[in-house]
Amino acid sequence: MNQDIVMRTDALSVGYKDKTVLKDIFLSVRKGKMICLLGPNGAGKSTVLHTLARLLAPLGGSVVMEGRELATIRAGELAKKISVVLTGNDLPGLTTVSELVAMGRSPYTGFFGRLTSKDEELIEQSLRDVGAYDLRDRYCSELSDGEKQKIMIARALVQQPQLILLDEPTSHLDVSRKVEVMRILNRLAAEHGIAVVMSMHDIDLAVKCSDFIVLVKNGEVIAAGSPDEVIKPGVIDSLYDLRGASYDEQTGAVELAGGESRDMFIFGRAGTASNIMRAAVRLGYGVGFGVAESYDIDAHTAKAVCIDRFINISDGPAPDSLYDEAANAALGYRFVVDSGFPDADGGRLSAAMDESEKKGLRVIRRGEYSSLEELINIIKKQ
């Protein structure tokens, strides 16, 4: 067996009693690597974690750790190899942080739970590793959700495991705490060589922080591999059955789709149009856009939001024909908005917008508004 592989599953099926929730799971969990399970509610992510933690028995296939079937490893020995952090764990309110983390040493301290100086050092180091040493004397009832999650990770770490299993470690946390938790897990994997398997709903963080992604839906693993291999155009939309929205694989953003009627065409580029597009979507308007390079953030937003979008995908400068197509398409909309774009093409985008005005379209010029709110008020009157 490869020495880097901490755990391996072969054709694993998981579920409850005789009901299979997810089948044919093939995983190689490696030292220092993070695996993330992504999928809709009820897809079986938590069931997989419970099975890997031996809280549930496999319904088929096998789970092997260090060349041994998981079911054959004694509980005390397994507790030194695997730590589990599940959602919904209510911490004992009258227990201090240090006391709670010390419970993670129970596989090593014996029946009476006496802590040695080595145990005390490991407890302190685990708290420092997760940035929670200053919380050591506080009661668990005094902690925020983010602090509780850090403490649970510290308790898992003090077990000195080869593998940590986490069920939605960022749920109920604000953005700052989510980022902090993920950075802690990344650091533990990199510095301690701990393998991490987790379930998540934060797609953007999962993609940015994981080495390996597993997509699960309708009882099956539909894709598995590195984020670059798995997260392709349309995959996340299909995974979560997104309607009226789409996920941008490049930016990690979910954008709401605009209306179906052709109401407003925006001439823009260089990030000047994205917020205007989103404002139009909130008003229920159908939107068109042009002209931008494929790497422009406005191009990414337009792909998700707009009915018509004119994006330069060639290796060189946008051809004149693309500007002509945008100008002609704009004539099919009720009015035009100037996003205040920089002149980076010798005035060709401005000329295309001017052509719309010559053909009788109302053009809301950048000089007519000084803020997005002012623009929205003008748009509502059109």
Locate predicted features.
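ABC ATPase nucleotide-binding domains
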Residues: D241-A318, V337-S339, D345-G347, R362-Q382
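Helix-to-loop junction immediately C-terminal to a conserved catalytic motif
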Residues: A53
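Conserved ABC transporter NBD signature motif
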Residues: G61-E69, L78
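Catalytic Walker B motif of ABC-type/P-loop ATPase nucleotide-binding domains
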Residues: I164-E168
